[in-house]
Structure formats: structure tokens, C-alpha cells
A protein has these predicted regions:
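Acidic/His-rich segments in extracytoplasmic proteins that coordinate ligands and/or metal ions
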Residues: 1-49, 117-159
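A structural micro-motif
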Residues: 16-18, 25-26, 78, 105, ...
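Extracytoplasmic metal-acquisition and chelation regions
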Residues: 22-50, 88-101, 165-180
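Basic- and aromatic-lined ligand-binding clefts that recognize polyanionic substrates
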Residues: 53-105, 176
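Short, conserved clusters of charged catalytic residues that mark active-site
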Residues: 58, 65-67, 116-119, 152
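Short hydrophobic segments within beta-strands
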Residues: 81-83, 135, 171
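Short, solvent-exposed loop/beta-turn-alpha elements that line the ligand-binding surface or hinge
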Residues: 108-115
Length: 180
């Protein structure tokens, strides 16, 4: 999203503007997939543009096969609240709710393909999550652990079940959730 990543329009302005020495005929390929399917489609398009269609198809086929294996795993009723930011609170969006579903869980806030957005304390409380995933965009595991600790001190939400059951998890966002 444009909160933590440079927008494609900003990139185009810089690359085709006076700040850059690239010729104005340079083709800019913007990738903005918001779901597993869209990301796979964009990989194939990129393969076409780079004359690497065979390699792109191999990567997509491998990803689809891996995903299909996950579909056979048990499904759980647990709701996971994934937070891409904690001040203000941002819900996870784009492909993250789909990742949660593929793993066999339910997204407490956010649906496949929706943009990340600011969420209120009330929405967090109403979502009644079983678990909270701290996946602050652009941060590694050790930094997200610090954010999770800070979250535990937030009196507006630290009475929720995940805090009582110690079901607050931190992840390396760049490795698993940020732009692929």
C-alpha cells in the first residue's frame, strides 16, 4: 500500500522525470497483486515482458502446487487479528487475509484483496480475536517483537483473550507478508 511502499505513480514520475537519466521510452512494469491469484498472474505477465515465460510459469506452477498441498490441511475456527501497524492500528490487507485462510484460519478483520486500513479500538474489540499477529510492515522479527511488547501495555485492548492466553505472535513481515 502507499503507506509504507512507494506508489507506482511516484516511481513513474521519478523514473521518467528530470531526476532520472532513463530515456522516456523506458517501460515501467507496475505489479500490484492483492491476492494469490493476482500475484501469480502478474508473475506470468512479468515473464512475458522479460522474455522468461517458461521460468515464470515454472515458479507459478510450483507456488500453486504448494498452495494446493495446504488446502488439504485441517481448518480451524480460530480468528487471527493481523496488525500491519499499531499506532494507529492498521488491519492487514491485500493478500494477508488470504494467507490466513490458506493456513486454515479466519481473518478477524479484513478480507482477501481489501486494502490495509486504519481500524478503531472498537473494531478490534468487536472482532473478538483468538490470536493477534504483529506484522508491522517493513519490520523484521526482532522489531515486531518490540511492537508486540508495546501492544501488551495498551490498556484499551490488553484485556482481550489473546493477551490473557499469551497468543500474541510476532513475525518477520518482510519475509512473509510485505510486498512479495
Amino acid at each position: 500500500c502507499d503507506v509504507c511502499a512507494i506508489s507506482s505513480s511516484e516511481i513513474e514520475v521519478v523514473l521518467k522525470g528530470t531526476l532520472c537519466t532513463l530515456p522516456s521510452s523506458t517501460q515501467i512494469i507496475s505489479l500490484n497483486g492483492k491476492s494469490f491469484e493476482e500475484i501469480c498472474s502478474e508473475i506470468l505477465k512479468l515473464g512475458e515482458q522479460l522474455d522468461a515465460e517458461k521460468e515464470a510459469k515454472q515458479h507459478v506452477d510450483k507456488a500453486i502446487a504448494r498452495r494446493n498441498k495446504l488446502d488439504s490441511l485441517p481448518k480451524y475456527s480460530r480468528k487471527i487479528l493481523s496488525l500491519e501497524w499499531i499506532d494507529p492500528f492498521f488491519s492487514a490487507g491485500h493478500w494477508v487475509p488470504e494467507q490466513i485462510e490458506i493456513a486454515g484460519f479466519r481473518s478477524a478483520i479484513g478480507q482477501k484483496g481489501e486494502h490495509s486500513r486504519v481500524i478503531s479500538i472498537e473494531e478490534i474489540i468487536e472482532s473478538d480475536p483468538d490470536d493477534i499477529a504483529v506484522i508491522c510492515c517493513g519490520y523484521k522479527l526482532h522489531e515486531n517483537k518490540l511492537f508486540a511488547e508495546k501492544l501488551k501495555n495498551n490498556k484499551e485492548i490488553n484485556f482481550l483473550r489473546p493477551f490473557k492466553t499469551d497468543n500474541i505472535y510476532s513475525f518477520d513481515s518482510d519475509a512473509y507478508f510485505s510486498r512479495p
